[in-house]
UniProtKB/Swiss-Prot annotation:
GO terms for cellular component: cytoplasm. Aspartyl-tRNA synthetase with relaxed tRNA specificity since it is able to aspartylate not only its cognate tRNA(Asp) but also tRNA(Asn). Reaction proceeds in two steps: L-aspartate is first activated by ATP to form Asp-AMP and then transferred to the acceptor end of tRNA(Asp/Asn). InterPro entries: Aa-tRNA-synt_II, aa-tRNA-synth_II, aa-tRNA-synth_II/BPL/LPL, Asp-tRNA-ligase_1, Asp-tRNA-ligase_1_N, Asp/Asn-tRNA-synth_IIb, AspRS_core, GAD-like_sf. Keywords: Aminoacyl-tRNA synthetase, ATP-binding, Cytoplasm, Ligase, Nucleotide-binding, Protein biosynthesis. This is Aspartate--tRNA(Asp/Asn) ligase. It comes from Chlamydia trachomatis serovar D (strain ATCC VR-885 / DSM 19411 / UW-3/Cx). Residues 201-204 are annotated as: Aspartate. Homodimer. Its EC number is 6.1.1.23.
Length: 582
């Protein structure tokens, strides 16, 4: 049986007089007495079909029994709609199909939520439980089809650039990469476990050792970590690695790749992208993921804070803290109530409070007005280039606290005051990250232990490791990190040195990374790589609020699959086969 001659988005006035066959779901049903109208929907669009009782009473009776989301196959004649009855919201809105025969292919139960009315707000848990119904509402399928086109564009471009797609193993060895591993018990080796990959990091580096010049993979990765709006326990990344190159070779390739991906949605990007060091980003925006669609740039105010008699300023400076903030153009219209709300907001991030200074009619209004002279305030206005009716918002706190609080505050204010265009795409490369971070007073990798230090900082590894910068880079878009990578260590002695600084014993290194150190010891080319978060890119590209909206079958924020009721208990016999007990 041939189910269709056309899709539900294809018919137009050019087809009037043709006999056609369509298949799809009942999107909407309307019985106007002697006339039944059905909007028939498939993946591609909607076509109105119609049956008149006076012309075909038996068929009219059958169509009158049809309900929402039944699957139909219909035959009929394409006719022009009556003048004034056209639907400009449909590509098929100038025609309708007068049905001559109808077959019910599948019936549907009563729906848990409306599919035809996309504007009805449906609880997300209910949507995820019935994900297959949620897909029919339109947005999800549109995003999945866009994702498909993005992956096609990715593969085509990287092939043009000489990259080879290689699939790396899913079952691997548990190695410390930052997050917790998902572990898979081995039946054949009782008491031993595979780990699902947090990334193909070691495999792709070993591919470079093996002589592959350029590698890529659209890889599924797994991390057992606490979830946020832009995180999932399993996610997809565009993984890349290349030999005999540095950042200056990689950046143009990635910029053109991103441009090709955005071109799928008709968005034109300009390259090269802006570059900024990690320290510049922290100093000016309080974060290594700055949103550059708007200003509100941070400025250090310590030299002016010392001229105050305000104890909170002076105490923070005495204990090595900072005073910094930003200027909000036209922000002098903020009420006391609004400023109190902002004060409570920054306290969530550890700040003690918020200092505000308004420039109004050439004078000063401030909650710290009595702690400094008029001249000091005027100096601050000049430093911030503040104009009349602007406001300065300042925080006195340890550097990390001040940065975090101000980062969140500037984003909040920019959103509330509509200081940016939501259709604007501002990319920036963040470079020269610290090689190490501090965790409970100990060294830990800022990215991962395979990142190469900058050549000029290698001499500091023993004397001042926290001052060592790395040859690493993130690509940030509108405040989201969408890619991260680095130059890799290709010298086994330097790699062992990094492991030693991280206080990994030789036994531990041999157990977890012995195979990798062995590989580096057989002649390894200089190499570097990057991974682009496909889910995050799709989230930004399609305007989705979370990455759950761009994944076919996502997990909840508690890492559960509501549709399949996973994770689930397993049978005692399965545990026994694995040599496990609960």
């Amino acid at each position: 049986m041939k189910y269709r001659t056309h899709k539900c988005n294809e018919l137009s006035l050019d087809h009037v007089g043709e006999h056609v066959r369509l298949s799809g779901w009942v999107h909407r049903y309307r019985n106007h007495g002697g006339v039944v109208f059905i909007d028939l929907r498939d993946c591609f669009g909607i076509t109105q079909i119609v049956c008149r009782q006076e012309e075909n009473p038996e068929l009219h009776q059958l169509m009158d029994q049809v309900r929402s989301e039944w699957v139909l196959c219909v035959e009929g004649l394409v006719c022009a709609r009556l003048e004034g009855m056209e639907n400009p919201n449909l590509v098929t809105g100038s025609i309708e199909v007068e049905v001559s025969s109808l077959e019910v292919l599948s019936r549907a139960q009563n729906l848990p939520f409306s599919i035809s009315d996309e504007h009805i707000n449906v609880n997300e848990e209910l949507r995820l439980t019935y994900r297959y119904l949620d897909m029919r509402r339109g947005d999800i399928l549109d995003r999945l089809m866009c994702r498909h086109k993005v992956m096609l564009a990715c593969r085509q471009y990287l092939d043009e650039q000489g990259f080879t797609e290689v699939v790396t193993p899913i079952l691997g060895k548990s190695t410390p990469e930052g997050a917790r591993d998902y572990l898979v018990p081995s039946r054949i080796y009782p008491g031993n476990f595979y780990a699902l990959p947090q990334s193909p990091q070691l495999f792709k580096q070993i591919l470079m050792v093996g002589g592959l010049d350029r590698y890529f993979q659209i890889a599924t990765c797994f991390r057992d970590e606490d979830l946020r709006a832009d995180r999932q326990p399993e996610f997809t990344q565009i993984d890349m690695e290349m030999s005999f190159g540095g950042p200056e070779d990689l950046f143009p390739v990635v910029e053109e790749l991103v441009a090709r991906l955005f071109a799928v949605k008709g968005i034109e990007l300009k390259a090269p992208f802006l570059r900024m060091t990690y320290q510049e980003a922290k100093d000016s925006y309080g974060t290594d993921k700055p949103d550059l669609r708007f200003g509100l740039r941070l400025k250090n105010c310590c030299e002016y804070a010392r001229k105050f008699t305000f104890s909170i300023f002076l105490d923070q400076l005495a204990y090595g803290g900072t005073v910094k903030g930003f200027c909000v153009p036209g922000g002098a219209d903020m009420s006391r109530k609004q400023l109190d709300i902002y004060t409570d907001f920054v306290k969530r991030y550890g700040a003690m409070g918020l200092v505000w200074i308004k420039k109004q009619d050439g004078g000063v209004s401030s909650n710290v007005a009595k702690f400094a002279s008029e001249d000091v305030f005027q100096e601050m206005f000049e430093a911030f280039e503040a104009k009349d009716q602007d406001i300065l918002l300042l925080i006195a706190a340890p550097e990390a606290v001040a940065n975090q609080a101000l980062d969140h505050l500037r984003r909040l204010i920019a959103r509330e005051r509509q200081l940016y265009d939501s259709t604007q795409y501002n990319f920036v490369w963040i470079t020269d990250f610290p090689l190490f971070a501090k965790e409970e007073g100990e060294l830990c990798p800022e990215h991962h232990p395979f990142t190469a230090p900058l050549d000029e900082d290698i001499s500091l590894l023993d004397s001042d490791p926290f001052a060592v910068r790395s040859s690493s880079y993130d690509l940030v878009l509108n405040g989201y990190e969408i890619a991260s990578g680095s130059q890799r260590i290709h010298n086994p002695d330097l790699q062992n040195k990094i492991f030693a600084l991280l206080k990994l014993s030789q036994e531990s290194v041999k157990e977890k990374f012995g195979f990798f150190i062995d590989a580096l010891s057989f002649g390894t080319p200089p190499h570097l790589g990057i991974a682009l978060g496909l889910d995050r890119i799709m989230m930004v590209l399609t305007g989705a609020e979370t990455i759950r909206e761009v994944i076919a079958f996502p997990k909840t924020q508690k890492a559960g699959d509501l549709m399949m009721s996973a994770p689930s208990e397993i049978l005692p016999i399965q545990l026994k086969e694995l040599g496990l007990k609960l």
